[in-house]
């Protein structure tokens, strides 16, 4: 860059280059910025398509509500159906269902904010594994701790897992670069806000949120132990 060539002192040039590289790595960590197909965008698109199906079948209305029977037919998580009738597939399908436009809008916004960073950090395949494990873990805790007549839908468990994974990843890399330290503070702030909402708002499945959060944190920790860090890629990328 021209600003680098105009520097007279070698140390000043080095500082300018370092700052430019830091900004470049930070901006490269956004959703889909690693090139090719973005899993985060695919997941958002899939959730939106399923939401349209919910509207068409009456499983939900624009502002929520709708037919509980229609939601069950689409795969909502009903503990009684899983534990008694062994409909284990509901633990997976419920992750793609939402109750109203506000529910899906908030979840997809959160997925867009944190999903792209985590996808860059661990890679597409491991991001999918992390997402699914977190969502399924949230469903497991619903089965264990929620009333058997609960009807649970939403991607919140999987998204909380991404939050937990991103927090652990940034914490373990906090001494390596500035963006990891900054990211850690931002993620922890968002986590605190979301946890406050989880335990203060009505009709929110804390079981799905906490189950996903813990599973995401543990899963990415295991990935980092089993992988190697490459300092040339954002956030100490896991291979």
Stretches found by the model and what they are:
Residues 2-239:
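A detector for small-residue-rich transmembrane helices and their helix-helix packing motifs
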């Amino acid at each position: 860059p021209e600003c680098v060539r105009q520097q007279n002192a070698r140390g000043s040039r080095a500082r300018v280059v370092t700052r430019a590289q830091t900004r470049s790595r930070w901006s490269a960590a956004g959703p889909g910025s690693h090139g090719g197909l973005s899993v985060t965008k695919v997941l958002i698109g899939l959730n939106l398509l399923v939401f349209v199906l919910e509207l068409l079948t009456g499983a939900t209305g624009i502002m929520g509500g709708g037919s509980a029977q229609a939601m069950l037919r689409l795969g909502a998580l009903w503990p009684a159906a899983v534990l008694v009738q062994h409909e284990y597939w509901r633990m997976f399908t419920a992750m793609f269902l939402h109750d109203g436009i506000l529910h899906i809008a908030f979840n997809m916004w959160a997925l867009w904010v944190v999903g792209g960073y985590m996808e860059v950090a661990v890679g597409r395949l491991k991001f999918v594994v992390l997402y699914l494990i977190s969502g399924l873990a949230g469903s497991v805790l619903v089965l264990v701790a929620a009333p058997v007549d609960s009807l649970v839908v939403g991607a919140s468990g999987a998204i909380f897992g991404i939050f937990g994974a991103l927090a652990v990843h940034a914490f373990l890399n906090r001494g390596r670069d500035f963006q990891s330290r900054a990211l850690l503070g931002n993620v922890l702030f968002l986590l605190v806000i979301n946890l406050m909402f989880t335990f203060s708002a009505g009709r929110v499945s804390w079981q799905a949120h906490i189950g996903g959060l813990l599973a995401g944190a543990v899963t990415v920790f295991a990935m980092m132990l089993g992988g190697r860090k490459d300092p040339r890629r954002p956030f100490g990328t896991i291979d």
